[in-house]
Amino acid sequence: MSTVICMKQREEEFLLTIRPFANRMQKSPCYIPIVSSATLWDRSTPSAKHIPCYERTSVPCSRFINHMKNFSESPKFRSLHFLNFPVFPERTQNSMACKRLLHTCQYIVPRCSVSTVSFDEESYEEFRSSPAPSSETDEAPLIFTARGETEERARGAPKQAWNSSFLEQLVKKPNWAHSVNPVHLEAQGIHISRHTRPKGQPLSSPKKNSGSAARPSTAIGLCRRSQTPGALQSTGPSNTELEPEERMAVPAGAQAHPDDIQSRLLGASGNPVGKGAVAMAPEMLPKHPHTPRDRRPQADTSLHGNLAGAPLPLLAGASTHFPSKRLIKVCSSAPPRPTRRFHTVCSQALSRPVVNAHLH
């Protein structure tokens, strides 16, 4: 009787401890109540004289075993197989089944192109290899380990940007901005002075450089010269360089001999002025205007002596023979040096074409 009383007390204590767990299992949807308030083991009442109380062994109840078997075969329990624990020894899974279960249950993480672990290692190695800033407190040199050197050798030196073939070709090409190529520079608008000035020679006056001979030959100037081969170059000063007194004296000279000046302007320029094209005759060659008051006897004798043995200059568009006696007489005589007024008149352009009717 004493053993039965002890068993009842133990059963009551066990039920008191199991009740909160049973309530939790009933509230959760994933669990099914496994046991009821019935006893979990068979209460065999052997004689006390054969088996003492402390030697009594508890055996699971047959109903509990059947219930657990049915529950393990249910689909709800199969959905809990990812926990990978055996319920009963007879239903244990073999090693291959466990491996398959682990392989199927693992999450598949997409692998990126650049591993973060390798990137962290490379950044750490670069940080170690970079020279530390020198300070008063930390002046110790950076110590490289053998492992870091071997890893750097295995990884290889990084390719730099200037090693590319495209940049090497750009470096090997000559610099066109510094090369002396007149055609290329003239196309870009850079003019080169072909008349190099010596170091000791001073700069000439602007009046002397105003002529076209002292100007650098550009592409535009060459085209204009090729179009007008018979044009004469005027070496006189421009209109902006004339003095006020000379500008006032120009109209007076023009009014004195208007026809002669106009005919000489046509012969000196080499091209007819205006829209109409007039053919140049040998008789229309220019004459140097001179008046009795402007003649200089000293200049006449010197020029006559210098030009006596010199051949007569020929224009590009003029013929080689001279049919007119008047032209031969004019060319044989030594004309005086043209005055400054003649240059100022030649530098001015006529407003309208003039017909030289008096020469025909």
Curated annotation (Swiss-Prot):
Residues 202-212, 225-241 have a biased composition (Polar residues). It comes from the Eukaryota. It holds the Pfam family DUF4607. Residues 193-245 are annotated as: Disordered. InterPro entries: DUF4607. This is Uncharacterized protein C12orf42.
